[in-house]
């Protein structure tokens, strides 16, 4: 439905594994050595750690990028040599699945694209949005595509990829372990949308 070059990625969360370092091990001078995998970090998950300290830690251990931080820290992250891995736009709560949100989503996506261009980032995140009474999955998908088509040219012109995030709606044991009611919660839905 939309050019794959502009909406090419589904952002997915990673699950911690036994192979990951403990916090204590990471503080003993751990450094990524061979750089076969370019790694970045989701900043908000380290709250309440100060962002400037997080940026310095990312550089110290050899990460290449950071995302999920307040935009006011982008200049410091770039100066430290980190990429901005993903620029935010509208949140996941109010998405383009509901036409009532289109103006806001489009404005925030265009702003995200402009910010990404300014800071040398290559990706901006978008979401589907929470389920809205009276809007089924098929209509939600059509609504999303209508909104995304209004920003896709701007993204392509600036060399920015829009990344559609698929969020889990099943696990509701903690506010950030699931997103009950999120409409873009299946790979099938998201693939059909892009």
Language model segments and positions:
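N-terminal export signals
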Residues: 1-21
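Surface-exposed charge patches
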Residues: 30-32, 56, 75, 114, ...
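Active-site-proximal flexible loops/turns
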Residues: 10, 74, 172-173
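Structural motif corresponding to the early beta-alpha repeats
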Residues: 45, 61-152, 156-161
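Acidic/histidine-rich catalytic cores of soluble enzymes
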Residues: 55-59, 145, 149-194
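C-terminal segment of N-terminal export signals and the immediately downstream linker at the start
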Residues: 15-49, 57
């Amino acid at each position: 439905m939309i050019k794959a070059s502009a909406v090419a990625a589904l952002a997915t969360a990673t699950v911690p594994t036994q192979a990951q370092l403990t916090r204590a091990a990471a503080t003993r001078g751990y450094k990524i050595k061979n750089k076969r995998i370019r790694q970045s970090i989701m900043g908000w998950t380290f709250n309440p750690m100060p962002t400037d300290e997080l940026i310095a830690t990312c550089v110290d251990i050899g990460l290449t990028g950071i995302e999920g931080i307040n935009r006011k820290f982008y200049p410091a992250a770039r100066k430290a040599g980190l990429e901005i891995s993903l620029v935010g736009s509208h949140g996941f709560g109010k998405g383009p699945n509901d036409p009532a949100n289109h103006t806001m989503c489009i404005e925030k996506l265009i702003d995200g694209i402009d910010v990404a261009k300014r800071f040398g980032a290559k990706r901006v995140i978008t979401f589907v949005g929470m389920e809205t009474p009276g809007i089924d999955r098929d209509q939600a998908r059509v609504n999303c595509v209508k909104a995304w088509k209004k920003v896709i040219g701007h993204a392509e012109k600036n060399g920015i990829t829009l990344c559609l995030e698929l969020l889990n709606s099943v696990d509701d044991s903690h506010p950030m372990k699931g997103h009950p009611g999120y409409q873009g919660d299946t790979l099938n839905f998201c693939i059909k949308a892009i």
